[in-house]
C-alpha cells in the first residue's frame, strides 16, 4: 500500500473512532440545554379537570390543632369546599421555606388547607408542624408514597387546588411564594370560589 493510501486509511479510522464521542457530546449538549430550559412549575398534570384519586390515608399520630386531633385524609375530604392540598415532607428544604406562607394562608376561611405528608417519619412530621405552626385541617400520612403517585406528584412540595365538586382545578409544582401565589394560584382560587 502506498503512503497516500495508508494516510487515508488512518484518517478514516480516526474519524470512525471519534464519531461515537462526537455523537455522545452532541446528545449531552442537547440534554443539558433542554434540562436548563424547562420550568418545573409548568409540568403538566393529567388530573386537571378530573376527580381527586380515591385514597384513604391515616392521620399523623399525636398531631393536634387547637387541642383537637388532626384527622387523616381521604377523597371524601374534598367534597363541598374549595381546598388546597399541599404535599410536603420535613426533609424537603423548599417545604421549610413555604411553611410560614402556608400558616398565613390557613387564615383564609374561604378555603380549607389539607396536607399529604410524603415519605416521612411521624415524629419528624410532628416536629416540623409544631415548629412552623400547623396550617392543615387534615393531614394524611403517605409513608410509602403510593397516594402521592396516584396524585401524579413528581416531588415535594406540590400543591393542588380542588373545587367544591371534588375535581382538580390546578397544580403548582414547587413551593408557594408570595409572588407565585398572587400571580398564578390566587386567580385560580378566585375562579374556583365563583
Language-model segment annotations:
Residues 1-62, 194:
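N-terminal targeting signals for export/organelle localization
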Residues 14, 130-135, 141-193:
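Thiol/disulfide oxidoreductase modules built on the thioredoxin-like
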Residues 53, 88, 114, 149:
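Conserved Rossmann-like nucleotide-binding pocket used by diverse enzymes
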Residues 55-83:
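A short beta-strand-turn-helix
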Residues 81-83, 88-91, 155:
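Short pre-active-site segment immediately N-terminal to redox-active cysteine/selenocysteine motifs
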Residues 84-86, 115, 161:
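Hydrophobic beta-strand core positions in alpha/beta domains
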Residues 87-104:
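Conserved redox-active cysteine motifs that mediate thiol-disulfide chemistry
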Residues 105-144, 156:
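Conserved segment of the thioredoxin-like fold in thiol-based oxidoreductases
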Amino acid at each position: 500500500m502506498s503512503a497516500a493510501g495508508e494516510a487515508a486509511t488512518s484518517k478514516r479510522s480516526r474519524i470512525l473512532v471519534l464519531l461515537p464521542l462526537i455523537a455522545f457530546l452532541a446528545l449531552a449538549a442537547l440534554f443539558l440545554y433542554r434540562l436548563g430550559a424547562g420550568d418545573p412549575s409548568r409540568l403538566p398534570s393529567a388530573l386537571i379537570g378530573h376527580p381527586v384519586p380515591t385514597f384513604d390515608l391515616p392521620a399523623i399520630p399525636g398531631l393536634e390543632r387547637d387541642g383537637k386531633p388532626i384527622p387523616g385524609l381521604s377523597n371524601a375530604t374534598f367534597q363541598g369546599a374549595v381546598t388546597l392540598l399541599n404535599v410536603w415532607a420535613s426533609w424537603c428544604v423548599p417545604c421549610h421555606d413555604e411553611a410560614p406562607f402556608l400558616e398565613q394562608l390557613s387564615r383564609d376561611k374561604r378555603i380549607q388547607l389539607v396536607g399529604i405528608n410524603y415519605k416521612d417519619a411521624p415524629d419528624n412530621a410532628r416536629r416540623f408542624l409544631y415548629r412552623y405552626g400547623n396550617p392543615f385541617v387534615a393531614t394524611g400520612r403517605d409513608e410509602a408514597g403510593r397516594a402521592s403517585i396516584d396524585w401524579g406528584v413528581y416531588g415535594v412540595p406540590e400543591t393542588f387546588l380542588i373545587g367544591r365538586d371534588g375535581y382538580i382545578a390546578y397544580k403548582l409544582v414547587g413551593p408557594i411564594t408570595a409572588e407565585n401565589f398572587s400571580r398564578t394560584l390566587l386567580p385560580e382560587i378566585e375562579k374556583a370560589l365563583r
